[in-house]
C-alpha cells in the first residue's frame, strides 16, 4: 500500500510539470484518485480473505462453525464478499477506471511521464483487484502478494 502513496506523490509532482494541458491533467488526476480508492477497497477485501483463510487453517473455523476444508470456506466467503457494499463499490470503481483509461492513451507530450506513472500504478492495482476478486494460490503467497 505504501507503494501507492509514493507513486501518487510522484504522480502529483509530475502533474505539476504538465500544467499546460489542464483538462487532461484533471482527468488524469481524477483517475489516479479513483485508482487509489480501488486499491484501498481491494486491500480491505484481501485482508478479509487472509483473516478468513488463517482462521480456517489454524482454528478450523469459518463463520463460527467447525470447518477443515479451507477451499470450501473460501468459496463460501467469496459468495459472501460479492454481496457486500465494499465489493459493489470496488466493482463500480473498477468499471469506471476501465472506461476512462483508454481515453487517457492520447496524452500531450508534456504529460507522458505522468501517464506512464499512472499506467504503472494501474497495473499494480489491477493485480490487487484480481486477488480481491478471486483469491488464489496458497495463504503464504496470497498474503505476501497482497
Label the predicted regions.
Residues 6-8, 26, 51, 144:
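Intrinsically disordered, low-complexity regions enriched in small/polar residues
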Residues 14-16, 56, 119:
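Extended aliphatic helical segments
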Residues 18-82:
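Immediate post-signal-peptide N-terminus of mature secreted/exported proteins
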Residues 60-146:
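Long, amphipathic, charge-rich alpha-helical segments that form helical bundles/coiled-coils
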Amino acid at each position: 500500500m505504501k507503494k501507492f502513496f509514493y507513486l501518487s506523490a510522484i504522480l502529483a509532482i509530475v502533474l505539476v510539470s504538465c500544467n499546460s494541458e489542464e483538462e487532461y491533467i484533471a482527468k488524469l488526476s481524477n483517475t489516479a484518485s479513483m485508482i487509489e480508492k480501488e486499491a484501498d477497497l481491494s486491500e480491505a477485501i484481501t485482508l478479509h480473505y487472509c483473516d478468513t483463510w488463517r482462521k480456517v487453517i489454524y482454528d478450523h473455523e469459518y463463520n463460527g462453525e467447525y470447518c477443515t476444508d479451507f477451499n470450501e470456506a473460501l468459496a463460501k466467503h467469496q459468495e459472501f464478499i460479492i454481496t457486500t457494499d465494499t465489493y459493489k463499490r470496488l466493482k463500480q470503481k473498477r468499471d469506471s477506471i476501465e472506461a476512462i483509461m483508454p481515453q487517457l492513451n492520447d496524452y500531450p507530450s508534456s504529460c507522458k511521464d505522468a501517464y506512464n506513472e499512472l499506467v504503472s500504478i494501474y497495473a499494480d492495482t489491477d493485480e490487487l483487484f484480481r486477488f480481491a476478486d478471486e483469491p488464489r494460490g496458497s495463504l503464504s503467497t496470497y498474503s505476501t502478494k497482497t
